[in-house]
Amino acid sequence: MKSLLLLPFLLLLANCSTSPVPVLPPPPGETEPLMEAAAPPPAYSGGMQQIINVSAYDPKAPLRHGRGYSENDVSALRANGASGLIARAGKGGNLDTKCASFLTAADRSGLLPGVYYRVQRHVDPVAQADQFVSRVQSLARSRSWQAPALLLCGDYDGDLPLASILRFMDRVQSRTGVIPVAYLENSPQLKLQTRAADAATKARLRQAPYWLALYSHESGAGPIFPAPGTPEGLVDQYHLWSHWTLWQYGGADWERGASRPKVYNAGRYRFRPFFGNLDRVVERNVFRGSPAALAAFWQQHGLRLR
């Protein structure tokens, strides 16, 4: 899952809320490489459920004082209000080395576990789907799970043809009975394809819940499409789904030799640069719905574990 160019920010980002909140200047020392950690947010900040996604690149290096986590202990994520964790299973034919450890730790901490696979153009999508499903089935058999289901997601590169996305979806569904969630970048190539797709292709793609990526209200401006501005604006540009289901609003960018927060903060969506009192950047998402809706969604688009 790609990061975008980090925007300068001079203000301390306000806590997650569905309505505007005051933005205060940073306290003394806030711009130092190691800053003091903020207090943990409420479990369901802004009424939206918080989901963390991870890969072998995580955890990233600490940037301030606070709580850390590892692939073997994600209790700090749960303590700071996360409801679920989605780990990368593989990418373009290669399996992720930390996936199993992250999922075991997530289940032990009471987080809903999920997996995603980064689908790339240079490898046959059916072969990637087979690798994904085989890995998922192996994980499902690997332990006695507390969670009822393992969420399945496809992370589709921005240069993929829609036919490849459909082939991946079809193969995963044929082998598991589950339609994987569709993670799409803020990609002009994909937007042009979805807008021009025939009715049958659009209907099939709509069966996959939309997981969007938008880290800034200024991201995505180009010669074809303006910056979408909001998650709803990005939904409109794809001209396919009626709404988003998951939104990746926070990630990391590489700046001056370190990972720095890249977090959406505009209009009625105000998120802090760090997740609660964590000492480092994490990839952050929100689910559009209640805790009960999240549980139902996880089971509908997940492989049963018990």
Where are these regions (language model features)?
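C-terminal motif of bacterial Sec signal peptides marking the signal peptidase cleavage site
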Residues: 12-15
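Functionally critical loop-and-helix segments that line ligand-binding/catalytic clefts
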Residues: 20-61, 205-206, 210-306
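Polar/charged alpha-helical tracts
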Residues: 75, 79, 134, 138, ...
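Positively charged n-region of N-terminal signal peptides that target proteins for export
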Residues: 1-4
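Catalytic domains of cell-wall/extracellular-matrix polysaccharide-remodeling enzymes
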Residues: 148-236
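Short catalytic/ligand-binding loop motif for oxyanion handling, primarily in non-cytosolic enzymes
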Residues: 123, 189-192, 255-256
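Substrate-binding cleft of extracellular glycoside hydrolase catalytic domains
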Residues: 29-178
